[in-house]
């Protein structure tokens, strides 16, 4: 549901998601956070794992710039249902993932990537709030030279299309 929203506009299948998430469920040094409401309903999730265990598409820009992926913890998803946004849970997701990253031997940086979309994208809602202010407050810096290409099927599209994602990095 959340990834169907702008900016990802993802329309994948459950099997695609299971395959993607298997990296996290099979890695002993990954972290999967599930946020639940008072009734036990899932309201959000967040993930991280050493960059060396992430998909090769995410490691490639680091290799091509002479950076050692072993020094990075890759922060994957961080999603919350709309009623739960703006309550500090996103910051808590970062707190937990940064603490986990610091516990991993040799990891010196936290990193994640975000899809690049033009500000005038036709599917951008008027009410869209960019998470970039949160990322800046947490001292993440956009790294325009570190980009990855990852393909997925967008809503109302017949097949997968490539998307550029730019990495953000923070020293730990």
What is the role of each PLM region?
Residues 80, 86-102:
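Conserved acetyl-CoA-binding loop-helix of GNAT-fold acetyltransferases
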Residues 75, 94, 101-127:
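Conserved GNAT acetyl-CoA-binding A-motif
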Residues 7-38, 42, 47:
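Active-site rim helix/loop that mediates acceptor-substrate recognition in acyltransferases
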Residues 45-77, 122-123, 128, 146-160:
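Conserved acyl-donor/pantetheine-binding loop and adjacent beta-alpha core of acyl/acetyltransferases
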Residues 31-33, 71, 162-168:
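Short beta-strand micro-motifs in enzyme catalytic cores
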Residues 1-5:
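A short, well-structured alpha-helix characteristic of acyl/acetyltransferase catalytic modules
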Residues 46, 94-97, 135, 170:
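Polar/charged side chains located within well-ordered beta-strands of beta-rich proteins
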Residues 127-133, 138-141, 148-172:
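C-terminal "cap" of GNAT-fold acetyltransferases
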